[in-house]
Amino acid sequence: MTEAKTEIMPRPQMSGAEMVELCKRHTMYEWSVQSKIDPIPVAKAEGVYFWTPEGKRYLDFNSQLMCSNIGHSHPRVVHAIQTQAAKLCYANPFMATEPRARLGKKLASICPGDIDSFFFTNGGAEANENAIRIARAVTGRHKIMVRYRSYHGGTAGALTMTGDPRRWFTEPGIPGVIRAPEFHKYGRKDPEPLEACIRDLEDVIRYEGGQNIAAFLMETVVGTNGILIPPDGYMKAVRELCDKHGILLIADEVMAGFGRTGKWFAVEHWGVVPDMITMAKGLTSAYVQLGAVGMRAPVAQAFKDRAFPGGLTYNSHTLACATALATIAVYEDEGLMAQAVKLGGILRERMKELEKKHPSVGATRSIGLFGIFEIVRDRRTFEPMAPFNGHSEEMTALGAFFREQGLYTFVRWNTFFTNPPLVITEAQLHEGLDIVDRGLDITDRAVKA
């Protein structure tokens, strides 16, 4: 068994134990029982790796929270942050700045179709909140259609629009949110037939009244709820259904955008232009917080002669906009879209090999460098290795093995993710998957005979 690598590092001000103790004493960890949290202390990061204060190295196989797309501490982005901070950190959103102007123009050039107006936020949840507010203002309608297997952010409205169990404790939430089934049902290996998927959507629209629905908010490729990739024809049919009823289509690309699937935005794989597109995470590769709502011309023009219904102190934050510009330049100049396609093919091939080798792997899914393993006790029944919204000894042991071996990824319910930074090399990709290969021996032992 290969041990995780350890480096001798200059001693920081705090040890790892001190970091953990003080963080747990004085700060809250999200979505977690505070007495059970066991965070990894992080002192520095570079490329696809990060290190503890004591020098233990981890391969970041999840790009932190699917956001560090260009890797850690990229010198070009660090320099852009330093340069902008020395010149102008902040100007209020009623002013004009060069980074804001240049970023708006740049996003207009890379977004699908005629999306060319942007409202900047602090992150993905705020982007989705503002997108539905815009949709309601433009259409004069109130209802927002979403899907069950989804996550749209941690603010009040975004959580209401979220389908997964993180919304439960906030219910009833904001009014007007209606839910439709996902194209890939929980506990099944494959998506539903296309005709059945569209029929489900048509039923919800019929029962709720298409004339009452302002927007359909959807993750183009569903992220934390399973890396669910829409079947061919689905996005086109959704676009046609929205057009038929005058419903605005909002593509949540917070996680799937900026090269993660091998395109600037995942929706480009299916040749569909949404009315609005939301983004964050890879927009700055999480170096500085920034999100955005992109709007097609007809949506943006609705506010030419009336007030735009939103505002934030940090809207169009100067330092964040400069960071985004530098990040986008890295994607372009280093060919990271092509890199995601090339290495995504290698990732998919090795994931399928591991699926064949290990009986506990019920399914693997990936598009670009956006992937997931689904772990089961029985391939015939697709019984999950851990229950919906729950844990199991086997999945806990698998996560502990990854951590011991220096592989960082997200283990959730009966799944774990393969979402490395786009700058990963083929050798580094195999390094991570070799650890996965050994770890799956743990879950294989729990497979029913």
Whereabouts are the PLM-identified features?
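Conserved N-terminal phosphate-binding loop of PLP-dependent enzymes in the Aspartate aminotransferase
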Residues: T2-A449
